[in-house]
Each structure stands twice: as C-alpha cells, then as structure tokens.
C-alpha cells in the first residue's frame, strides 16, 4: 500500500510534502493538513520516485527527524533507517522553494548553498530536551508546546515573503517556557 496521496495545490504551484510516517512527529501534520498538498509519507518509497516527485513540484516541504546529513525515514516493517532526503537530492532541490523542519536542516541547506525556511535543532521529544538541560517536560507536554508553532506554520506556509513568515511565526509561537525559547532561536531563513 502506498502512502503517497495526491492533493490540490494553491495558486497553481505544485506543493509536495515529504513527511515520513512516524508517530513521534505526528504533530507536524498540522502544518499541511487541509491544504490539499501532495504528500509522501511512505518510508519505503523508492529514491527514484522521490526524485520524480520533487522534479514535478515547485515547492517542497520536508518534515520529521533528521540530522545535518538529511531527513530520516524509518521503515517499521524492515527496521531500516535511511536518509529519505540526502546529499544526492541537493541539485534537484536547488531549483525549488524549500521549507524544512527537522533537526539541523538549516545545516543541510546551508552546506548546499540553498535558501529557504529551515530549522536548526528543534526539541520535539523529552529525550532531546534533556540533552539540552531541559528536564521538566515529558513527550506529551513538548508536543503541546509545539502546536502553536505548527498552527503558525500552517497559516503562513503559502507566504512568499519568508522574513514576514518568520516574523509572524515567532509572534505567535511565544510561550513562556524553556522548550519554546530554545526552539524559537532555531527557526531560520537562509
């Protein structure tokens, strides 16, 4: 069964969301739900299909867990981890509008000389918070702190002016807690 769904795009732009299926990043669905975008969330999708889909879209939104090396996908059926977005995709992404939220995605795009809306380290789990000395949150509470960010991204994702998009997101994602403070510093425009 393929987990690729075809949707409608806004203003004649073809938008592709790459968000590998992962319960720990379900809150990220709020960024694109109801938008009618094409979505890839199948962790076993072939690299050739990913490349084909990227080539046929104008704007690429990439969400999930990752590293400076790319966006990670985990196939529960096989136990295999892989970079579903990696250095081999850089050349085709250079001609696209790119938006990403995975840990250190800004380092990936900066290394390849690409602009766009990208994140540094974003705390999305209690384990990550503890790595940065934030101990008072559990996974559920962290997911709750992220919802204003997800809703702000949902409401601004179609904006052309990325600086204005970032300004509005930071204005709306402004809770008085350590996770929010940490994450706000890592919402970047390249």
Residue map of PLM features:
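Short, T/G/N/S-enriched strand-turn elements that build extracellular solenoid repeat scaffolds
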Residues: 48-53, 71-72, 87-91, 110-111
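Active-site-proximal C-terminal subdomain of hydrolase catalytic domains
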Residues: 97-190
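Short, well-ordered coil/turn elements that cap or connect secondary structure elements
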Residues: 34, 93-95, 111
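Short, glycine/charged-enriched secondary-structure capping and boundary segments
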Residues: 30-32, 74-77, 113-115
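A short, glycine/acidic-enriched catalytic loop
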Residues: 67-94
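Short acidic, S/G/P-rich loop/turn micro-motifs used as interaction or catalytic elements
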Residues: 21-25, 45-47, 65-72, 104-108, ...
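Active-site-adjacent structural elements in enzyme catalytic domains
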Residues: 10-11, 93, 105
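A domain-level signal for caspase-like cysteine endopeptidase catalytic cores
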Residues: 2-63, 99-101
